[in-house]
Amino acid sequence: MSEPGKGDDCLELESSMAESRLRAPDLGVSRCLGKCQKNSPGARKHPFSGKSFYLDLPAGKNLQFLTGAIQQLGGVIEGFLSKEVSYIVSSRREVKAESSGKSHRGCPSPSPSEVRVETSAMVDPKGSHPRPSRKPVDSVPLSRGKELLQKAIRNQGSISGGGSGGSSSLLTNARSWGVRILHVDEMMMHVQQLSLASLCVKKQQPKKPEGTCPAAESRTRKVARLKAPFLKIEDESRKFRPFHHQFKSFPEISFLGPKDASPFEAPTTLGSMHHTRESKDGEPSPRSAAHTMPRRKKGYCECCQEAFEELHVHLQSAQHRSFALEAHLYAEVDRIIAQLSHSFADIPFQAGLPRWSGSPASDCDPLCPETLHPHQPSHPRAASPRIRKEDSCQASVTQGRAAGQQRWTESLDGVMGPPASHTCVSATTLLPALPKGSREQGCLCPCPASFTQSHLVTSLALLPGEWSPAEDMPLHPSQENSFAPADIPVKGPLLFPEARPWLMSARCWVRPFPFVTWGCLIPHDTTPLHEEVSPCPCLRLGYLYLLLTQSLWCRVRVPSLSTAGPIPRTSHPCTLAFPSYLNDHDLGHLCQAKPQGWNTPQPFLHCGFLAVDSG
C-alpha cells in the first residue's frame, strides 16, 4: 500500500508525459508506461525489451548517455545498420525538420503503430474525465509540389552536412527499409521520462518484511563470527567454500562415571540436585558432599518373563538358575543349531586343555566337576546347560586318561527309581576287576551314568529318537547278537529328531536321570544327527554299535570296519577288550585315528559309553 502523496506525484508525471506526447514524436515508450499498471514488474523495468537502436551520433556526452540508458531499459545497440534495426537515432537537421513539420501538421508520430500508447486509462490529476484515445490518422498522399519541397530539403541537408554522401545514403536506406528515424533531442527527452517513471515505480513497491530474502542477507553479510559450539569444515586447497554449523549444545565425552555408564552422558551428582537451603532460624544448612550416583541398568528377562533392576542380581536368583539348568527348555534351540552347517576344523585332543583335579586351575574353577560336591550349588556362571556339558565332557575324558582320579557319580535304586545315593568310584578299583591281560588289551572308558555295586549298568546308548516309556521296554537281539534300529521298540511320537541318551540295563532301556546333561559337542563330520551327544570319545571314532548284557556273550560291531570281525569278549562279564589296532590307553589318540569310511552314516544304533560293573 503506497502513500497518497507518492501516488499523486506519479499521476502528475503521467499526465505531463501525455501532454508532451503531442509536442514530440512517440517512440512507443508512452504505451509501455501505460501498461506498467497491468504488466509484471519485469516489463516496467525494461520498456525497450525486444527493440534495437542504431545511433547515428558523433562522439560525445549524448552518445554515452543514450548508450547506457537504452541498455538499462532493455534495448540493444546495433553497430551496423540493417533491416532488423527498429530505430535510428540521428542528430542531422533534416531529421529534425521532418519531425517538427509532422508534429505541426498533426501527423502521427514516427513511432511504429504496434507500440502506440493508449491514453484512455490516464486520469487528469484535477479529477476530470479521461481523455479519449487518439486514433491514428491515415497518411494523406502528398502532392507533387510537396514532394519536390521535401526532396530539396533533403538535398540541402546533405550539402550542409559536409557533402558526405554516406550519411544521405544511410538515411535513404533506412527509409527504404521502413526503419523509424528519430532525432536525438526527442530520444533524450523520452529516455529521461522513462528513467523518472522507473524511479516512481520503485518507490511505490512496499518493502518486504524481514526474513523473506535470506539470499540477499547472506550476500551482504560475508563475514561473521561463529559462536561456540560449532563445527566448521574447511578445504585445504581453498578451492571450495567451508561448511559450518552452529549447535545449541554439543556432546562431551566423560570418563568420570562408572564403567557401565555412557561416556556421552555427564554423571549426575547429588550435589547438583540439592541447593543450599536456609533453615527456619535463618542459618544456611550445610551442603551435602557431591558424589557420583551409579546408574542402575534395568532390563527384561525373556526367560523368566519379568523385569529386573540389576542384571547381576537377577542372574543369581533361584528362578533364573532353575530355568537355565533345565535342558528341555533349550531343546528347540539345539535342534535349530544342529541344522546349521559350519566349516570349523576338527581340533585334535590335547592333553593340556582338560583341567586336572590336582591343578590350581581346577581348585579355583567353580565349573570344574572334580571340585564340586553333588550337593554343592553350582556357580552363577553355569547359566547355560551347554557349558556344563562341555566341561563335563572334558572332565570325563581326563578321568579315563588318568588312573586314580575320583569323580562323583549318581546311583540308581532299581531300574526306574530315582538316584538314591552318591558313591565315589575310583578307576583304580575297577581296573583290578578285569582279567589278567585285559588291561593291556583294552582301555576303560568311564561312564558318567549312575551305577551301584548291586545293580549292573552296562552301557549308555543314544537312540535315534526320544519317547516316553511308561514301562520297561525289553529288547530282543537279532542275528549274531546284534540289534538293528528296526528291533528297537518305538512308543509314542518322536518329539525331537536328534538322538537322546538312554540307559540300557538288563536288556531294558530306561529313561535316564540327571546325568542326561553330561553332553559335549561332536563335529558334524562324524555324526549327522545333532551336535549334542554323550562325552564318550568312542563316538568321535565313528558309528560304534555295541551291546553289553549280564550274560556271557558280548558282540561289538564297527560298521565301517566290518572286515575286522567281532571284538573278542573277555572272561569277565560286561567288559570289553579292544583289538590290537585300537590298543591305546589314551582315548584321545582314538579320536584322531579315523580310518577311511568312518564318517559315512550307518543305519545302526549310536552308542555312547562303555561301563564296567563296579562290583
From Swiss-Prot:
Q: In which residues is Zn(2+) bound?
A: 301, 304, 314, 320
Task: Report the gene name.
Answer: DBF4B
Annotated Gene3D superfamilies: DBF zinc finger
**Phosphoprotein is among the record's keywords:** yes
Q: Which InterPro entries match?
A: Replication_Regulatory_Kinase, Znf_DBF, Znf_DBF_sf
Q: Per UniProt, what is one Pfam family of this protein? A: zf-DBF
Keyword line: Cell cycle, Metal-binding, Nucleus, Phosphoprotein, Zinc, Zinc-finger
Segments forming DBF4-type zinc fingers: 294-343
GO biological process terms, alphabetically, are: positive regulation of cell population proliferation; positive regulation of G2/M transition of mitotic cell cycle; positive regulation of nuclear cell cycle DNA replication; regulation of cell cycle phase transition
Domain annotation BRCT: ranges: 43-133
Q: Know the name of this protein? A: Protein DBF4 homolog B
Posttranslational modification: Phosphorylated.
